[in-house]
């Protein structure tokens, strides 16, 4: 079953005569259970592609489909909700909220979503990541 798909994804930056085509009709399909590596030289469009797949940027044309939902057609509010509930994105230079402790940084997206915090689930994340000694309340 396809969990992620792009169809003729194009991303262009700039204006004539200085247009840069970062993605040029990229079509991929990733099925459930597959492991995929995106590799390429500097400037080849890897980060641009990941930004499209993560819903952080919109394509100039083409479609991005995650779990049968065409995310490239969502408005900003819909995309924010979809991304918060369905996509995990780890940035190369991640930024935690410095005034929050470890626990507060972990539960922040749950609180922003207005969802109930499952303390057992949060505890399992903390244990899995080995962050018990970093908790300061």
Identify the meaning behind each predicted range.
Residues 3-6, 12-25:
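A short, flexible loop at the N-terminus of ABC-type nucleotide-binding domains that lies
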Residues 39-41:
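The feature captures the beta-strand-to-loop junction immediately N-terminal to the Walker
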Residues 69-70, 117-134:
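Conserved ABC ATPase "signature" region
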